[in-house]
Amino acid sequence: MPHSDELDSRDVLSVSGLNIAFHHEGQQVDAVRNVSLRLKRGETLAIVGESGSGKSVTALALMRLIEQSGANVRCGEMLLRRRNRQVIELSEQSDAQMRRVRGADIAMIFQEPMTSLNPVFTVGEQIAESIRLHQRASHEEALAEAKRMLDQVRIPESQAILSRYPHQLSGGMRQRVMIAMALSCRPAVLIADEPTTALDVTIQAQILQLIKVLQQEMSMGVIFITHDMGVVADIADRVLVMYQGEAVETGSVEQIFHAPTHPYTQTLLAAVPQLGAMRGHSLPRRFPLISADEPALYESQIEQDTVVEGEPILQVRGLVTRFPLRSGLFNRVTREVHAVENISFDLWPGETLSLVGESGSGKSTTGRALLRLVESRQGEIIFNGQRIDTLSAGKLQPLRRDIQCIFQDPYASLDPRQTVGYSIMEPLRIHGLGQGDAAAKRVAWLLERVGLRPEHAWRYPHEFSGGQRQRICIARALALNPKVIIADEAVSALDVSVRGQIINLLLDLQREMGIAYLFISHDMAVVERISHRVAVMYLGQIVEMGPRRAVFENPQHPYTRKLMAAVPVADPSRHRPRRVLLSDDIPSNIHKRGEETPAVSLQLVGPGHYVARPLQDNALSRL
């Protein structure tokens, strides 16, 4: 049925009176109430709000995917203008018709790429499949286009990446693959649900620039769902603010940032972490929080040095981790990924050492090597005076109580067949630390400490938002009262208020229990807030390391300065300068087998502040 008269000539999407409800334990739970929005060609509409506010549910409803979760969707209208200019009512389309519409006319980039990519197919096959389906291209043409899209999202060694599987890529690279797949068919509307959450600041800036360039070329409408107000200021034309399932304020990006009218919008903006806010402070400080009852900011700024002098609890010496790449007729190892190259550092009790760097720089691999989830090629890992890199699995088991981890992808970390209460209780049972009522009380306490309710223990992972799932993973990591927690992008999926709550919780636990954190993150504003010391990684090596104040207030290495410059600012009047993205600007840590990476030499430039000699590298020479 044509609906062209009901849609303005410049609009590509119009939604009015959207209501979404779920049935839980015999009761109806309203997730979205009476939300309306319009999107014009070439326009970017940002939908912002806290975790659980209904942002992602709204996006899934537009894709007609939410019904598969048992949702009840009621809507006045949901009109889409396809690439061929035909206007259709999305709610009237059959499943077969929607399969033709998805990808070709309306595409979506999901928040968690590992759950969106098929683990049994290569990256190239998955991108090519979408191109073959919607553009009727041959297999060879589709693979060539897939490589071109990987080049556009700046994945190094794109030809080699085509034949790799999702689990062989870092979280940031998987997200770039998702973006390439969504843009491959040049849809009329692109829905981006936290598309840069897993990306470091430099790649994030480049991806945002890429989306804007492609948007201008194709007159594509973009719905950008995010909790990062700096990204909103950088990319959005208009903003829709959601709170508890309702649209509480909408307007141009200038109106929302410079003259917000709703109290929730005002407090949301005030809670945004700003790079440079820690200038003059040497110790970590708590984030200001949003009170749910009264939208005002409050914080405790009592600075306390939690670092315990004496012997480090964790020592890393000359750590090297490499991964083989096979090719050829006989599937021999011909090249290697030099993920971590000769890095050394110490971690003291009660200290937070942050590892920062681009996706693929070796941050996460370092954390996994310390946990013995991947085996290192050489080097020493010493925990509490005991070398652990040579221990057998049986002897390593008791030590796992003292070293816990929080991974980047919460959905992949939780068993979808078990309640979250069982997942949190499982470590207690494995290590014989609690049974029955005692374990249940511990689970209830942990859920409350991370901002959830005790009754949530009976729910399953799919019933929570991405941010809530990450809080569950943090609760599980805290269950055993560890001495060291390796937090791999632990707060990257959380909105600003929940992120602040979790960081404050980590700081409180550090103060109470003396926990040491190895904090792996690409969020420089969060790193500045939580860290005692910072180590900057580039292509598997540490190029700058020192006290947080020294590194942030006086960065010495050009790569560190590049990371600082790429941080988005929550002010639409202060745009980053754009630069041309060059193909040879893509760093790569893939080398021929037997080829050694030149080791960087760290020089002391201040108290505890070490900087590598400038790298002779094409990418860094232009910084």
From Swiss-Prot:
Q: EC number(s) per UniProt? A: 7.4.2.10
Its UniProt entry gives the catalysed reaction(s) as:
glutathione(out) + ATP + H2O = glutathione(in) + ADP + phosphate + H(+)
GO cellular component term, pick one: plasma membrane
- Which terms under GO biological process does the entry name? peptide transport; transmembrane transport
**Which positions are annotated as binding ATP?**
49-56, 357-364
Cellular localization per UniProt: Cell inner membrane
How does this chain sit within the bilayer? Peripheral membrane protein
What GO terms are given for molecular function? ATP binding; ATP hydrolysis activity
Q: What InterPro entries is this protein classified in?
A: AAA+_ATPase, ABC_transp_ATP-bind, ABC_transporter-like_ATP-bd, ABC_transporter-like_CS, Oligopep_ABC_C, P-loop_NTPase
Q: Which SUPFAM superfamilies does the UniProt record give?
A: P-loop containing nucleoside triphosphate hydrolases
Q: Which residues form a coiled coil?
A: none
The answer to whether the entry has keyword Repeat is yes
A Pfam family hit: oligo_HPY
Name all ABC transporter domain ranges.
15-269, 325-564
- Keywords in alphabetical order, please: ATP-binding, Cell inner membrane, Cell membrane, Hydrolase, Membrane, Nucleotide-binding, Repeat, Translocase, Transport
| Its biological purpose | Part of the ABC transporter complex GsiABCD involved in glutathione import. Responsible for energy coupling to the transport system.
Q: Which family does it belong to?
A: Belongs to the ABC transporter superfamily. Glutathione importer (TC 3.A.1.5.11) family.
Assembly, in brief, is: The complex is composed of two ATP-binding proteins (GsiA), two transmembrane proteins (GsiC and GsiD) and a solute-binding protein (GsiB).
Name listed for the protein in its UniProt record: Glutathione import ATP-binding protein GsiA
Q: Which organism is it from?
A: Salmonella choleraesuis (strain SC-B67)
